[in-house]
Amino acid sequence: MSGAGAPVSPQLNAKGLELVIIAASWHEKVMNGLLDGALRAARDAGIEEPRIVRVPGSFELPVAAARLAPDYDAVVALGVVIRGGTPHFEYVCQAATSGLTEVSVRTGVPVGFGLLTCDNDQQALDRAGLPAAPGFAGSKEDKGYEATSAALETALTLR
């Protein structure tokens, strides 16, 4: 699992920061886990009701982030792309990653990178922050929580 070496995040006090979470719709079960983790991280940092915006897929995350970033202190982009048998995976991953990076650098607003780019469904489930259930041991990582914490910590640093 790639989470080895991750820093221990400090307890954040982001009360008063404006946060928007942009979530793609593909891979509903994984997306629900990512969104739950993002909302938990926001609450843990003192943000009770961040704005949530849904977009069709991960390819649409950058345009939504570009439009919304100027009005917020931090943006979190959540999506899932799972490799298939065509080059589509590489195109979407590259476009979304480059687009989100450009938004953050151009606007100066931190964009939490919660885009899972996985080779298979199991990798996505392992990173989705899902609780244990019958037949499922639970996720090993919570990338929605991590992306939100990173965006908020960076926003506080830049204040």
Curated annotation (Swiss-Prot):
Reaction(s) this enzyme catalyzes, per UniProt: (2S)-2-hydroxy-3-oxobutyl phosphate + 5-amino-6-(D-ribitylamino)uracil = 6,7-dimethyl-8-(1-D-ribityl)lumazine + phosphate + 2 H2O + H(+)
EC number: 2.5.1.78
GO terms of molecular function: 6,7-dimethyl-8-ribityllumazine synthase activity
One cellular-component annotation, GO: riboflavin synthase complex
GO biological process: riboflavin biosynthetic process
Pathway the protein takes part in: Cofactor biosynthesis; riboflavin biosynthesis; riboflavin from 2-hydroxy-3-oxobutyl phosphate and 5-amino-6-(D-ribitylamino)uracil: step 1/2
Domain of life per record: Bacteria
Pfam families on file: DMRL_synthase
Sorted UniProt keywords: Riboflavin biosynthesis, Transferase
Binding site for 5-amino-6-(D-ribitylamino)uracil: W26, S58, F59, E60, V80, V81, I82, F113
Binding residue positions for (2S)-2-hydroxy-3-oxobutyl phosphate: G85, T86, R127
Annotated active site: H88
Family per similarity comment: Belongs to the DMRL synthase family.
Protein name: 6,7-dimethyl-8-ribityllumazine synthase
